[in-house]
Amino acid sequence: MPLEVVSFDMEGTLIEPRFSELIWEHDIPRLYAKRRGLTLEEARRRVFAEYMEIGDERPEWYDIEYWFRRLDLPGDWRELLEARRGVIRPYPEVRGVLERLGERYRLIVTSNTMREFLEVQLEGLREFFTHVFSAPSDFGEVKKTAGFYRRICDIVDVEPTSMAHVGDHWRFDYLTPRSMGMEAYYLNRGGERRGIHIVHDLEEFEARIRELDG
């Protein structure tokens, strides 16, 4: 079946991961240190231990509002996201690829990032996408499972074989969607891996899609 929809992962695919890394690894420990009167090093150790206690198999892991409550952090998490807006960086080729592919296909975002983050991260890019899906926010799932992809296909009214997807997680962006018949590609920006369904930037992905679809 001809392709109708092209799906993109978010962090590491469309934008650099710096925004989330700073919030989870620096800002939250910094606020915790301020609240508890700790050094940043000790605060980071305690906060990371709290993260591990929850673990990434639970939706709370991804929920910044939950962590502000759990850690009794000062301030408003929304203000923190706004304060870090300036570090958001799309990869250089992203806008051009979206402009060109958007002329032929419906474009969507499928991410396991919370919607609160996505809304900030997508500033300047939102116009390209007909739908933006967050696994934890929209479906209460912590990973991009086969069930997650099936629900997306139902919502956008397309068969899996008419959707392409690209992302930087081997299992959740490549193996899982590919097992359902999607034209999935693993994005390896570091260039360490090579293969017929491995691409190293989104321009290479675009070229593969155009070859596939004639």
Regions found by a protein language model. Give the residues of each.
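Asp-based, Mg2+/Mn2+-dependent phosphohydrolase catalytic module
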Residues: M1-V6, E16, E99, T110-G214
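N-terminal helical cap/lid subdomain that shapes the substrate entry/recognition surface
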Residues: P2-G96, E116-F117
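Short, surface-exposed alpha-helical recognition segments that flank or form part
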Residues: R85-R89, V109, G140
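Short beta-strand/loop segments at the ligand-binding rim of alpha/beta enzyme cores
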Residues: Y105-L107
